Each structure stands twice: as C-alpha cells, then as structure tokens.
Amino acid sequence: MGIFSEISRIEGPEFRAEVDEIIWLLTHGSQLIPVKSEVITYLYDASFIEKRRFTSFVGGYARMDSIVQEVNRCDPSDKDTCDHALILIQTSKDHPLTMSELQMLNEVTRDLPPEAVIHWGVGINDDLKDKVFLMIVYSK
C-alpha cells in the first residue's frame, strides 16, 4: 500500500521514556504549529497510551490517501475510549501539506468520542522529501 507503519501500546518500565520521547518530538525541531509541552504533560498520568506512526511512500496512492487508509485499517480498539489524541504531521519544505490533504485528517479523528481533546502539531522534516509522516497518540 506504500506505507510504513508502527503501532505500539506503551506500558511498563519504558513508559516514562516513551512519554519523554513523544513530548520531545512534538515540541522540538522545526515546528510550524508547535504543541507546548505543558499542554501535554497529562501523558505522564495516562492509564494507557497507544502510539501509531505512519510514513507514506511514493506509489499508486496519493500520500494522504494511503495514510488515511492505513489508519482506518488498523484502528485501535481503545480509540473509542480515549479522552485525548495527539496528532503530529510532518512534510518537507519542498512538498508542504496542501489544504485538501489537511482536510483528509478529519477521517483520522472522526471516530473519536465527541468529548476527546485533540492537540495538533505540524512540522518540517526535509528528510521526508515528498513523503508525509503522521504520528497519532491516543490516551486516557
């Protein structure tokens, strides 16, 4: 399908280190729309965290089409019980996100509970070239 995806449920002794990594990724680097670390420190008190990372590859699908299809294909069972979602999307400067691609992110959040709080971050990563990186962190 032209997607690299990684899915991990974070728990146990590596929990704090994983949360530190998530917060660092969302608050550092070249962020067009940064997420403030104090806004997402609730992650340290979460009863569960599920992290999903997707990177599109050039192929027969448009880059966001393929990501949305993959997100929907491997929907987490905890998505409907989460009360927070963090979403980070990155592209390169030479291949920025278009408005039509941004609108497709509605597909990623449509099944969240209506009271879920969503924090967004948009960043630049020139190593991506014409690909898109999407990270979603569901928590409660």
Model-derived segments and spans:
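Tubulin/FtsZ superfamily GTPase core signature
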Residues: M1-K140
